[in-house]
UniProtKB/Swiss-Prot annotation:
Its main location: membrane. The keyword Glycoprotein applies. Gene3D superfamilies: MFS general substrate transporter like domains. It is found in: Basolateral cell membrane; Basal cell membrane. The lineage of its organism: Eukaryota, Metazoa, Chordata, Craniata, Vertebrata. Secondary active transporter that functions as a Na(+)-independent organic anion (OA)/dicarboxylate antiporter where the uptake of one molecule of OA into the cell is coupled with an efflux of one molecule of intracellular dicarboxylate such as 2-oxoglutarate or glutarate. Mediates the uptake of OA across the basolateral side of proximal tubule epithelial cells, thereby contributing to the renal elimination of endogenous OA from the systemic circulation into the urine. Residues 1-9, 151-157, 202-218, 264-331, 384-389, 441-450, 500-545 are cytoplasmic. Glycans are attached at residues 39, 56, 86, 91, 107, 178. This is Solute carrier family 22 member 6. One of its GO terms (molecular function) is xenobiotic transmembrane transporter activity. Keywords: Cell membrane, Glycoprotein, Membrane, Transmembrane, Transmembrane helix. It is a multi-pass membrane protein. The gene is Slc22a6.
Amino acid sequence: MAFNDLLKQVGGVGRFQLIQVTMVVAPLLLMASHNTLQNFTAAIPAHHCRPPANANLSKDGGLEAWLPLDKQGRPESCLRFPFPHNGTEANGTGVTEPCLDGWVYDNSTFPSTIVTEWNLVCSHRAFRQLAQSLFMVGVLLGAMMFGYLADRLGRRKVLILNYLQTAVSGTCAAYAPNYTVYCIFRLLSGMSLASIAINCMTLNMEWMPIHTRAYVGTLIGYVYSLGQFLLAGIAYAVPHWRHLQLAVSVPFFVAFIYSWFFIESARWYSSSGRLDLTLRALQRVARINGKQEEGAKLSIEVLQTSLQKELTLNKGQASAMELLRCPTLRRLFLCLSMLWFATSFAYYGLVMDLQGFGVSMYLIQVIFGAVDLPAKFVCFLVINSMGRRPAQLASLLLAGICILVNGIIPRGHTIIRTSLAVLGKGCLASSFNCIFLYTGELYPTMIRQTGLGMGSTMARVGSIVSPLISMTAEFYPSIPLFIFGAVPVAASAVTALLPETLGQPLPDTVQDLKSRSRGKQKQQQLEQQKQMIPLQVSTQEKNGL
């Protein structure tokens, strides 16, 4: 409780918290756009083979003479006749060939995408999904690397670097001359965006008192959801993929400029043993919050007394290996990894297939964003009233059930299937909201950012595996849905192994975690003893004593 008392002394939730939270959270609007950007920049418009250069369509009988029809009576996308198909014996054999002269695309909805510019269709169709997978690989690498660096160098320095990297790599991707260069810059964007997400949560949470952490976590979730609305609007207004890529990347230059005014986490300073910087940060916050007199009362000696436990126990450098060495941290790491993986695995299985719903992609994008608002509000109520653990369990379990039921319903029931998918997506968005907050509250300060980074890493593993599972639909259409639904249902059971953090102070050390666990065991023993006392009295009364 020592550091929380210091926060209250310098103003609790004051002007500084409101300003910094707003500035840190604002870029998340466009982070949501980057994560699902390829739904629009890599959209696949209707297309068919281009007839040979020497073809005379007016003489041959029109375009239909060169294009075979599929089972639905539509022109084939990847095949054409080698000669005009006019019903003669020579040309009526059904012999086809690939699109040797390229493709003709329907540009009415999407004037230009990476698919149409680099012909990522037919035999090259897998390259479209590869670009998104490489972006997620970047997110995975960024979560691992920058999560560790943030625990070593601080949250503020890493955020400044991440804003610049996102702005530069995103802008360069918009001017990529070929597919390979585009993928490289998208990977770099993914690395920095992963770090922005986890550093945003941590920096805000470490400057907030206990009773406000759930509010901040919910706010971050809502900003991300609003970013999905924003993407639909920007993509509709800017349909050209290069212009859209620029529109969601250039604003990060603004974030890079104002991020120099962020104040580093005093909690991180103290956990690193740098009391001079801790004092300076707290006094600066006190001035902004109008608590100069309270800030003046602070000194190195006061901090040494207040933070004696943290300074004694936080001597070692945090590393990812600590998550496996310590039994207490190892159990947390394994359980949280399963929750992160399951949430991301099912989430991206749904949101990266907007064209599969058979309706306007812009409309589905808006609906997917809209469902987050009530879903996250309900999650917020559960988090604050019942706790983090029930909220995490319910969101994963309900999401899995919705997806599993969706796999059973026949394909013709479009409205029901879409409704279940939207409901499942809302539950998974709530799960993301909860797991960010829950993870940050479970790990001690000395390794919190590393823990969040490793959790985000497991989430990216899920998002990378998800497209591979989607490919199993070629064998049976419902196989992906059964898998996407079963994983979160199974993972929901893991929440029973995690402690509740509602109303608990943030742990600063591993010792805090162990003390909390021992305190819970003692409380359970006392409750059992209280239940046994009336029974003993009742037995004595029956014996006439």
